[in-house]
């Protein structure tokens, strides 16, 4: 599931952040994933049950922190599935246009992108959800075929494109910063790393299906680390060839299949007029087709992660029993899958991709940061619990994982932080209103210590919402984010007052 078609072009499509140094962005992102992957591997061998980071934190850091991580994972999987579904729709339009079949824009884009409703995006979510409801056995066979197809196309592109690499295109390898944070230079590399981090989303989702894996204590760590290594090599080689066959400025501002298509168009010889005639025009269609299939697996694994996390949270009483109901025929959480099918389908049909896409990386990075922190906790609180794999060089590896992920998060836009904090505050409201009252723990979060921690976290989030709002207003202005800023300030001050009242009352 790590081998996906996104990430490789995202840095270019968003005005160009890195230039040829995109390979460094992948290296930094992979480094952060490696640290987090080692921590995930220890937990997967120690606690081989569904729920991913939520379950790990529930067993080591308590219910409140587990809720925060679980709610963050819901954001991560929801926006990831939404973003990829919208992108799938765009690539489908491009593929059909190559066959001289033209779909009306009104039915392939949301209202903010010049359409009415994105029907293909909605339909692919429905199809993948129904696939998952039938069980992961069929999904695994389908996913295996897709991975084989994607890896084959990547290798074909690399092999055919290697001889067209022009080393002059790597100069300058790190373009000078434009004066704007995150546009080229070192800050651009870090922002690029945070964006392409989405391409590595997968090994954490793999751990959500631990209950359905044969011999999870042995196979989960192996699957996580080996897949991470293989995909890092594939991504970096692919990016190296892309930036070698075409100058990085050729990718800026392109839409659709442009990142790969532009590179393929440069894989040829110039004619008498100086125009390059591509030697492999068929490769474009093959790339688009593999991306379409590749996106299917990405959508499927994110939808799988969503339902499994909610399944675990419902088992613990933090969410209604609806989410833990198992279908007798298929032995899957069908009701939960259907709910997320509707939610993600509607988001994919009516929300612009740019809004959902910006949230994916920051949610993932936050979850990874907390998992790395959980390893430090579990080594002190549960040192004697058997595990077939141990994170090496503790506390160095977890600390490096925390620092790497936080560093990438800091270079994401301020409005992305605002949306994250707003989402977490909403989650805290649900925990206070339902989770604490229905927790299956003897006391749940309703202890003096738990209440103090809850109130402090709520107050910190509210203050952080104010800070990020002011940061965005000062650096970018009101602009298109005026509504978001107003909502964030109202939400922040309301919650500041609420949690200060709770602290005073205690």
Regions found by a protein language model. Give the residues of each.
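Extracellular loop-to-transmembrane helix junctions
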Residues: 10-110, 230, 237, 486-491
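Single conserved hydrophobic/aromatic residue that forms the stacking wall/gate
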Residues: 1-12
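Membrane-interface loop-to-helix entry segments
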Residues: 89, 116-167, 224-228, 360-370, ...
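C-terminal membrane-solvent junction of multi-pass transporters and transport-like membrane proteins
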Residues: 113-116, 323-332, 368-419, 426-462
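Junctions where cytoplasmic loops transition into the N-terminal start of transmembrane alpha-helices
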Residues: 21, 25, 145-149, 210-243, ...
